[in-house]
Amino acid sequence: NFDILGCHNYEYEPDKYKTGVRRIEEYLMKLRNYVLKSAHPGIKIAILEWNLSRTYDWRAGMHAAGSLISYEKLGPELEFTCPALLMRNTSDDPTWTAWIYHDHVSWFPGGGYVVEKLFRQHYAEIQYASTSGTFREEEDPFTNFIDSISQFKPVDWRPGTVDAIATGSADGKRIVIKAVNYEGIENTLITRIQGSKVPENATVKIYTIQADKNEKASLDKPDKIKPVESSMPYEKDMKITLAPYSVMVLEIVGK
């Protein structure tokens, strides 16, 4: 008998930084459902190693964002995840990439490290909703889409363009929306916040990481890829512009 079933989830081709997320998520969903229907439904899944393993540029960052969103969607059956490799010396074989690169005196982060640190800083344990893909924007999405969602027919559906998840803290004081835009064009995320505990007044802070998909940090420029903080007015219905090739964390804190 065993308690945890460990997996390795690597994407080996850098240009599959977004399609690899979907492939791995579909596999993990099937594995989770198989375990739940088995004679041992209490077995937990763990991702012992994962990464976009052949590059540490910003594609690895977007892949990390999509992967972490997928892992949150899997729910309590996923016990833990661990990216790999953690650290490499800059003189090592570059074939296998890492989260952190160093020489004998300094270091710089790979694209995945920057995203995982941001997501960890704004983690919220209760999952509310998630979405994937985009479609042609409506003139009034809150009326035409959200208010009539059961009858809505998305036009020009494009899967694999955006992944997003909304979570909240156990005390109900924070709502966190995390999203990744895999495309080289702007996309829009529309949100409606509702429920008995939704604050009437709140602050909204946005943390955005944006770069060309092939950009990467270095010993000379360790802060080449980093979050930029901004804010926006709080509304229960919000349209959020996702910059090209970007990862965004939006945090709402009730007053």
Where are these regions (language model features)?
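Active-site proximal loops enriched in glycine and acidic residues that flank catalytic Cys/His/Asp
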Residues: 9, 49, 82-85, 104, ...
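Long hydrophobic segments that form regular secondary structure
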Residues: 18-41, 56-62, 146-186
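Secondary-structure transition/capping motifs at alpha-helix termini
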Residues: 1, 33-43, 70-79, 125, ...
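Aromatic/acidic polysaccharide-binding cleft in carbohydrate-active enzymes
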Residues: 46-163
